[in-house]
Amino acid sequence: MRRVILSNPRGFCAGVVRAIQVVEAALEKWGAPIYVKHEIVHNRHVVDDLRRRGAIFIENLSDIPCGGKVIYSAHGIPPEVREEAKNRNLFDIDATCVLVTKIHSAVKLYASKGYQIILIGKKKHVEVIGIYGEAPDSVTVVEKVEDVENLPFGIDTPLFFVTQTTLSLDDVAEITQALKVRYPNVITLPSSSVCYATQNRQEALRSVLPRVNFVYVVGDVQSSNSNRLREVAERRNIPARLVNSPDHISDEILNYSGDIAITAGASTPENIVQLCISRLKELIPDLQVEEDIFAIEDVVFQPPKELRN
């Protein structure tokens, strides 16, 4: 008899819940249309649902009529976007994750103190673009270990590093180790820039990997943290697939013996996970479902002041 082990925590984090609730509350308070700068979170199911309810997702503020309402996505924005919104007389609401905002604030602070900032992350990811924009003359983005060797700073340059919140813990450990070897005096935040939810989901999955022969990560291909979960399994030689709906689960699984793990990215609704489990039960009728709880998450972020009762 085969088992599917559900890695827990999985799915929505506090920042994603807050961002979605911001859009829902804005639609309820002011009605459609409500404009959202970038996809509120990187998940097609969430975005499509909000679009049906009256949210309009845009990349350029010029697509919003003057005086309109705009919500900034959970990933954050560079300061010039806020300035443009002000110039266009837009009513803006910030749904940036609280933990991303913390990194923005740290980058501004240390840049003002004369530090060069090393930002570990993916250059094209919207979160990194937003953080970089806080101090473009002081920030250098590092994507991989090899980039550390190419940094132009002298050994005595005051250096401060932060990371994108959704990176692989494995990658961050390798890059920060290389950074500290080359620049022993580099400093960072007292706690990791990788958010609690990213850490919990990766560590929860790691804990079940010795018991399984295959992993499904339920998440969107655009989702950074979902892709990193897939990599956690693959680094440990466990076949893994990133799926965003039950339609993506094929009878390929019948070619593998042993138990299966399922986890989900931080922007994945739990109902999609349950649909994927149902699909697996169709393929493997005697499949047993087991929940594996690694940590209990009780983090809640308050809504922006514009939407508080």
Curated annotation (Swiss-Prot):
[4Fe-4S] cluster binds at C13, C97, C195. Binds 1 [4Fe-4S] cluster per subunit. Keywords: 4Fe-4S, Iron, Iron-sulfur, Isoprene biosynthesis, Metal-binding, Oxidoreductase. Pathway: Isoprenoid biosynthesis; dimethylallyl diphosphate biosynthesis; dimethylallyl diphosphate from (2E)-4-hydroxy-3-methylbutenyl diphosphate: step 1/1; Isoprenoid biosynthesis; isopentenyl diphosphate biosynthesis via DXP pathway; isopentenyl diphosphate from 1-deoxy-D-xylulose 5-phosphate: step 6/6. Its EC number is 1.17.7.4. (2E)-4-hydroxy-3-methylbut-2-enyl diphosphate binds at H42, H75, H125, T165, S223, S224, N225, S267. The keyword Oxidoreductase applies. One of its GO terms (molecular function) is metal ion binding. GO terms for biological process: dimethylallyl diphosphate biosynthetic process; isopentenyl diphosphate biosynthetic process, methylerythritol 4-phosphate pathway; terpenoid biosynthetic process. Isopentenyl diphosphate binds at H42, H75, H125, S223, S224, N225, S267. It catalyses: isopentenyl diphosphate + 2 oxidized [2Fe-2S]-[ferredoxin] + H2O = (2E)-4-hydroxy-3-methylbut-2-enyl diphosphate + 2 reduced [2Fe-2S]-[ferredoxin] + 2 H(+); dimethylallyl diphosphate + 2 oxidized [2Fe-2S]-[ferredoxin] + H2O = (2E)-4-hydroxy-3-methylbut-2-enyl diphosphate + 2 reduced [2Fe-2S]-[ferredoxin] + 2 H(+). Gene3D superfamilies: 3.40.50.11270, 4-hydroxy-3-methylbut-2-enyl diphosphate reductase, catalytic domain (3.40.1010.20). It holds the Pfam family LYTB. Signal peptide: none annotated. Its cofactor is [4Fe-4S] cluster. Dimethylallyl diphosphate binds at H42, H75, H125, S223, S224, N225, S267. The active site is at E127. Belongs to the IspH family. Catalyzes the conversion of 1-hydroxy-2-methyl-2-(E)-butenyl 4-diphosphate (HMBPP) into a mixture of isopentenyl diphosphate (IPP) and dimethylallyl diphosphate (DMAPP). Acts in the terminal step of the DOXP/MEP pathway for isoprenoid precursor biosynthesis. PANTHER family: 4-HYDROXY-3-METHYLBUT-2-ENYL DIPHOSPHATE REDUCTASE. This is 4-hydroxy-3-methylbut-2-enyl diphosphate reductase. The lineage of its organism: Bacteria, Pseudomonadati, Chlamydiota, Chlamydiia, Chlamydiales. The gene is ispH.
